[in-house]
Amino acid sequence: MRGFIFPLRQIGIGGSKMKKSKVFITVIAMAVLLLFFFAQGAIVMMTNMEGLKSILVRATVIWLLVIATIVFYLKRNRDLSILGFCKPMEKSSKRVFFYIPLIVIAISHFMCGIDTNKGASFIFANLIFTLAIGFAEEIYFRGIICRIWIDESVKKAVVVSSTLFAICHLMNVMGGAGIAETILQICFAFLYGIVISLVFIIGKSIWSCIAVHTLHDFCSFISIDGSLQMNVILGVIQFVILLCYAIYLSKQLPYDNQDV
């Protein structure tokens, strides 16, 4: 797919210089993403914002990041296919089992029901918010970070992007999540990152990644919180499904790239 791999070699950068360039781009990408994620959480905390207003403010900050990033790449490349904004590879949906495991995991958040007490505005606001998160995280972790490391090896691209994806969820501490809950979420996020990275590499398109990522967060945000026991059981089930799916996806890679 045109533009899928960052063309560092095409502009005369090779060897150690190319690796340093990748590290530099990765650091800058993480810094920009974390800056905006920190900002959206800090604004809410410093202003004691709650409810619908806080969701919309956080969504606005992240959408600003998404729009700014898209504008930057359009001006630089006049094409967003370099970020994976293109049609998925033919038959890639079949190779990733039509994303069914990820859809099942997302819907499983509704085991205790959907929080409808806060009204349609709450659900709509969370849709806007989670869509922003889906775009931002997939653009940066898959479209930028995973993409620039993939020409070295699939394994390195998956591990680097997934590790940073998991670390990024430390920001949830700023959002009020407990330490134990955040640690568990980081472990889950690492495995989830591996799966989404493999989906991205197999399909060479970011659209499906954004869709399933948004669906997962949206279902989680509007679901009713269960008991601790229920959450543990659900977490274990989701983890097992993800692990099996990751193994399955690794076998769908081209033979010369099965190093994950």
What are these regions (language model features)?
Residues 26-27, 96-99, 124-127, 155-160, ...:
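Hydrophobic alpha-helical transmembrane segments
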Residues 136-162, 201-205:
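Membrane-interface helix/loop boundary segments of multi-pass membrane proteins
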Residues 115-127, 174-188, 228-229:
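Juxtamembrane helix-entry segments on the extracytoplasmic side of multipass membrane proteins
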Residues 76-81, 247-260:
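Membrane-interface capping segments at transmembrane-helix boundaries
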Residues 22-74, 124-125, 129, 233-240:
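Alpha-helical transmembrane segments in multi-pass membrane proteins
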Residues 1-17:
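Short, Lys/Arg-enriched N-terminal segments with co-localized hydrophobic residues
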Residues 19-32, 53-63, 75-107, 150-157:
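Interfacial transmembrane-helix boundary/kink motif in multi-pass membrane proteins
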Residues 182-238:
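Functionally important transmembrane alpha-helices
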